[in-house]
């Protein structure tokens, strides 16, 4: 099958592989993106198990109470529009009042004038002339703490983190929000990683070890080590704490008397 330049670019952006390596992997995978990523990982042309850090810079996140919303736009020109920013805060407040814990629930939430969030976004898109949509929404019923991060001072917040927790050490809770914003964990703990994902990582790690010529008798040990690295990168509680990299996030939270129940991280462009 013919491989397009756009497909090659997408794979290069996601893996950091060279153009010819990316094209060869896509050809071998018959255009299957995920399979091509694995081929590059096994061959050593891509670094292991990382989502692309390249994110579109458009849209914003907004929060109210125990709710966090992510609203997407096509350009950062719109993201800086005062009417767009005001609408985002109005939408966050409506989502919080409704206890909307999903995108669909937030779109159906009522605004003060009786219209819905979905209606508001449709009207705003028509007025501005650009696609605007609610990309995601979350609401926590327990103790919640929110952190909003600006990638650029001339733009509204584009990364939002919300955690649900037990404990009284707000400084520690805020610190873990900074950790989530900076390190983009995918899961809270390794217990939450789906079994098929773990098995996939085991398979890829074994293939990489064999490609490197490692003796078969030590491959299981190598796989366990690389799987530990995967958990350390992708599971929040296993990550080294940015406040003290000699401790894990789990250790710093335990010392602070804080239990983290769950978290969400929204980022403009994701």
Curated annotation (Swiss-Prot):
InterPro entries in alphabetical order: EF-Ts_dimer_sf (IPR036402), Transl_elong_EFTs/EF1B (IPR001816), Transl_elong_EFTs/EF1B_dimer (IPR014039), Transl_elong_Ts_CS (IPR018101), UBA-like_sf (IPR009060)
Keyword Acetylation in record: no
Location of this chain's protein in the cell: Cytoplasm
Function field: Associates with the EF-Tu.GDP complex and induces the exchange of GDP to GTP. It remains bound to the aminoacyl-tRNA.EF-Tu.GTP complex up to the GTP hydrolysis stage on the ribosome.
Keyword Phosphoprotein attached: no
Family: Belongs to the EF-Ts family.
One GO term describing the cellular component: cytoplasm
Protein name (Swiss-Prot/TrEMBL): Elongation factor Ts
Species, as recorded: Cutibacterium acnes (strain DSM 16379 / KPA171202)
SUPFAM superfamilies xref list: Elongation factor Ts (EF-Ts), dimerisation domain (SSF54713), UBA-like (SSF46934)
Keywords, in A-Z order: Cytoplasm, Elongation factor, Protein biosynthesis
Renumbered residue ranges of the record's region Involved in Mg(2+) ion dislocation from EF-Tu: 75-78
CDD domains reported for this sequence: UBA_EF-Ts
Sample GO molecular function, one term: translation elongation factor activity
Pfam families recorded: EF_TS
Gene3D superfamilies noted in UniProt: 1.10.286.20, DNA helicase RuvA subunit, C-terminal domain (1.10.8.10), Elongation factor Ts, dimerisation domain (3.30.479.20)
């Amino acid at each position: 099958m013919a491989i397009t330049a756009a497909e090659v670019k997408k794979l290069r952006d996601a893996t950091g592989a060279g153009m010819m390596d990316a094209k060869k992997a896509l050809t071998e995978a018959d255009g299957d993106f995920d399979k091509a990523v694995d081929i590059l990982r096994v061959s050593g042309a891509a670094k292991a198990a990382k989502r692309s850090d390249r994110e579109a810079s458009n849209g914003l996140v907004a929060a109210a109470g125990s709710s966090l919303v992510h609203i997407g736009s096509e350009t950062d020109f719109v993201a800086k529009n005062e009417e767009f920013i005001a609408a985002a805060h109005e939408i966050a407040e409506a989502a919080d009042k409704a206890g909307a814990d999903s995108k669909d629930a937030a779109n159906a939430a009522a605004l003060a004038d009786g219209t819905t969030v979905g209606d508001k976004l449709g009207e705003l898109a028509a007025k501005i002339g650009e696609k605007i949509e609610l990309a995601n929404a979350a609401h926590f019923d327990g103790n919640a703490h929110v952190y909003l991060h600006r990638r650029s001072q001339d733009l509204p917040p584009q990364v939002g983190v919300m955690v649900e927790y037990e404990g009284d050490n707000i400084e520690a809770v805020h610190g873990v929000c900074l950790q989530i914003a900076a390190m983009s964990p995918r899961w809270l703990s390794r217990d939450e990683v789906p079994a098929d994902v773990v098995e996939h990582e085991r398979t890829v790690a074994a293939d990489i070890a064999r490609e490197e010529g490692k003796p078969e008798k030590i491959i299981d040990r190598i796989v366990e080590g690389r799987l530990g690295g995967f958990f350390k990168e992708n599971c929040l509680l296993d990550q080294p704490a940015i406040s003290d990299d000699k401790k894990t996030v789990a250790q710093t939270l335990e010392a602070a008397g804080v239990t983290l129940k769950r978290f969400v991280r929204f980022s403009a462009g994701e």
